[in-house]
Design a protein with these regions (language model features):
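Short, intrinsically disordered, charge-biased short linear motifs at domain edges
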Residues: 20-30, 54-56, 127-135
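Short, surface-exposed, charged/polar-biased interaction segments
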Residues: 25-29, 64, 104-108, 130, ...
């Protein structure tokens, strides 16, 4: 009988270890946007086809490697204004460039997402940015054409 206790203790320890290993897999995954920082500025990136510089929303000003950021509805600032310029220049959105991500900006982003066959959630984020979103090659969005971003 004394041999059974060590065996039971070992089995219990293995069960606990297995439970600890399995439990994280059973917990709900965090949303993709929760792990991605919000856009807070703009930076220069290169156009995929043209090789020309273009301004894109990024985590902070001057950080082109951090272009994979989120701009959810309700955001405001330079990154939103940049998004509105691009939506107007490349998708004829007709938005007022006011730096406020309201219902009209959200609707314009949804329209682009539908046309590019990505998840339609109205939020500009890494998926929208890297799957067909075009950016204006002109600083003001007036002329100059549009291009896709070159991944940094």
């Amino acid at each position: 009988m004394t041999r059974i206790r060590p065996v039971l203790a070992t089995m219990a320890a293995l069960a606990v270890t297995a439970g600890i290993t399995v439990l994280p897999a059973l917990t709900p995954a965090a949303s993709a946007s929760a792990s991605v920082p919000n856009c807070g500025g703009t930076s220069l990136a290169r156009g995929f086809f043209s090789g020309l510089p273009m301004r894109v929303p990024t985590v902070a000003n001057g950080h082109p490697a951090q272009w994979g950021c989120n701009l959810p509805p309700g955001s405001s600032g330079a990154a939103v204004a940049r998004l509105q310029i691009d939506l107007n220049a490349c998708y004829n959105a007709g938005l007022q460039v006011d730096g406020s991500y309201g219902p009209l900006t959200e609707g314009a982003v949804k329209k682009v997402q539908r046309s590019e066959h990505v998840t339609v959630d109205g939020e500009y984020g890494p998926q929208t940015a890297s799957h067909g979103f075009q950016y204006s090659l002109s600083g003001s969005g007036q002329g100059g054409g549009c291009d896709y971003i070159t991944t940094p």
